[in-house]
C-alpha cells in the first residue's frame, strides 16, 4: 500500500493502553485504536493523554491507525 492511499485525520489521545497503544478520539468524534510510528519510537517521542496528534489510517480498516505526528 502506497503512502497516497493512506487517510490522515487529526485527533486527541483519550487513553493510554498497554503495548504502546492509544485510544484516539478523532475530530469527527470517532474513537480508534492507534500505535506510534517507527520514527516516533526511534526518536523517543512521548505521547500522553490529551496530546493533539495526526493519525494515518488505511481505507480498509477504519478502526485502527498509526500516530505520525504529535503537535506541541
From Swiss-Prot:
What keywords does the record list, in alphabetical order?
Cytoplasm, Initiation factor, Protein biosynthesis, RNA-binding, rRNA-binding
Cytoplasm is among the record's keywords: yes
In what residue span(s) does the S1-like domain sit?
A: 1-72
On whether RNA-binding is a keyword of this UniProt record, the answer is: yes
Compartments, as annotated in UniProt: Cytoplasm
Output the Gene Ontology cellular-component terms.
cytosol
UniProt-listed InterPro entries: NA-bd_OB-fold, RNA-binding_domain_S1_IF1, TIF_IF1
Q: Which Gene Ontology MF annotations are present?
A: ribosome binding; rRNA binding; translation initiation factor activity
Chief subcellular location: cytoplasm
Q: How does it assemble?
A: Component of the 30S ribosomal translation pre-initiation complex which assembles on the 30S ribosome in the order IF-2 and IF-3, IF-1 and N-formylmethionyl-tRNA(fMet); mRNA recruitment can occur at any time during PIC assembly.
Family membership noted in the UniProt record: Belongs to the IF-1 family.
Q: What biological function has been recorded for the protein in this entry?
A: One of the essential components for the initiation of protein synthesis. Stabilizes the binding of IF-2 and IF-3 on the 30S subunit to which N-formylmethionyl-tRNA(fMet) subsequently binds. Helps modulate mRNA selection, yielding the 30S pre-initiation complex (PIC). Upon addition of the 50S ribosomal subunit IF-1, IF-2 and IF-3 are released leaving the mature 70S translation initiation complex.
State what protein this is by name: Translation initiation factor IF-1
> Species name for this entry?
Acidiphilium cryptum (strain JF-5)
